[in-house]
Amino acid sequence: MKVTFEQLKAAFNRVLISRGVDSETADACAEMFARTTESGVYSHGVNRFPRFIQQLENGDIIPDAQPKRITSLGAIEQWDAQRSIGNLTAKKMMDRAIELAADHGIGLVALRNANHWMRGGSYGWQAAEKGYIGICWTNSIAVMPPWGAKECRIGTNPLIVAIPSTPITMVDMSMSMFSYGMLEVNRLAGRQLPVDGGFDDEGNLTKEPGVIEKNRRILPMGYWKGSGMSIVLDMIATLLSDGASVAEVTEDNSDEYGISQIFIAIEVDKLIDGPTRDAKLQRIMDYVTSAERADENQSIRLPGHEFTTLLAENRRNGITVDDSVWAKIQAL
């Protein structure tokens, strides 16, 4: 089915207000969920909203909490999210990293005691729109087996890197081949995954999203490489924030909350003039996309460039929402 941005935001806002969230906070949170969905990231927008409400009702998310600065070391700051609303706090933390970068050339904010930030790419994009390189990542509850194991012991720990090119170039990727949100998107659409995304119950690689969702044997991105990246990203976020690791979140908490996150902004214009920056970026993009195609019907993609197209399409034609997901939201 198709809905408008206004319908989507109003539905989110209604549910948040009914759960006791104050009107200003509810409006800002609903706006972010609707923008994420409008950008085509359904897995961490509309599809994730019922799960967000569940955690709100369970007390994992404290809607009136505000992040608190703990330590300031020039270009580096450490904050405590105090289990505030994840997407609103993440936006504030990247804004703070940008402010630090304006003063120092680079800004790093390490955040502990945080909640799920929904679409991580929003915060990298936020920096790139202002002309900064944006880098951020988060740890999570253990939802992926380390390479060579059957049991979940590491997080998908998504990493975002956004570059202020025209259009913005951005990688937004979990350390698994697919996020659990994308497994859900493909399952709801009745599609197999385009490549193997995990193991079935017999230990064979599979493209069936429902099987992987159920047994949680999701495949690390690049096999042992994604497994290793997940571990070191967790270690850095834990140390810099003095926060909880994947092990602590998984073993000590009843659900995924109290996680650790990193936000970095770099002011490119302190290192290179604008015309030179643009020319260098354009040469990279032209060089990549001019390669001979393996399939003439498949264009060579640059990461993140599809979001500009998806956003325009959704604004023109309406936002596609799965019927079952919309029914869940209407019932909340």
From Swiss-Prot:
<comment type="similarity">
    <text>Belongs to the LDH2/MDH2 oxidoreductase family. DlgD subfamily.</text>
</comment>
<feature type="binding site">
    <location>
        <begin position="304"/>
        <end position="306"/>
    </location>
    <ligand>
        <name>NAD(+)</name>
    </ligand>
</feature>
<keyword id="KW-0520">NAD</keyword>
<dbReference type="GO" id="GO:0070403">
    <property type="term" value="F:NAD+ binding"/>
</dbReference>
<dbReference type="InterPro" id="IPR036111">
    <property type="entry name" value="Mal/L-sulfo/L-lacto_DH-like_sf"/>
</dbReference>
<dbReference type="InterPro" id="IPR003767">
    <property type="entry name" value="Malate/L-lactate_DH-like"/>
</dbReference>
<dbReference type="InterPro" id="IPR023689">
    <property type="entry name" value="Diketo_gul_Rdtase"/>
</dbReference>
<dbReference type="InterPro" id="IPR043144">
    <property type="entry name" value="Mal/L-sulf/L-lact_DH-like_ah"/>
</dbReference>
<comment type="function">
    <text>Catalyzes the reduction of 2,3-diketo-L-gulonate in the presence of NADH, to form 3-keto-L-gulonate.</text>
</comment>
<dbReference type="InterPro" id="IPR043143">
    <property type="entry name" value="Mal/L-sulf/L-lact_DH-like_NADP"/>
</dbReference>
<feature type="binding site">
    <location>
        <begin position="224"/>
        <end position="225"/>
    </location>
    <ligand>
        <name>NAD(+)</name>
    </ligand>
</feature>
<dbReference type="GO" id="GO:0005737">
    <property type="term" value="C:cytoplasm"/>
</dbReference>
<feature type="binding site">
    <location>
        <begin position="168"/>
        <end position="174"/>
    </location>
    <ligand>
        <name>NAD(+)</name>
    </ligand>
</feature>
<protein>
    <recommendedName>
        <fullName>2,3-diketo-L-gulonate reductase</fullName>
        <ecNumber>1.1.1.130</ecNumber>
    </recommendedName>
</protein>
<keyword id="KW-0560">Oxidoreductase</keyword>
<feature type="active site" description="Proton donor">
    <location>
        <position position="44"/>
    </location>
</feature>
<dbReference type="Pfam" id="PF02615">
    <property type="entry name" value="Ldh_2"/>
</dbReference>
<dbReference type="GO" id="GO:0047559">
    <property type="term" value="F:3-dehydro-L-gulonate 2-dehydrogenase activity"/>
</dbReference>
<keyword id="KW-0963">Cytoplasm</keyword>
<comment type="subunit">
    <text>Homodimer.</text>
</comment>
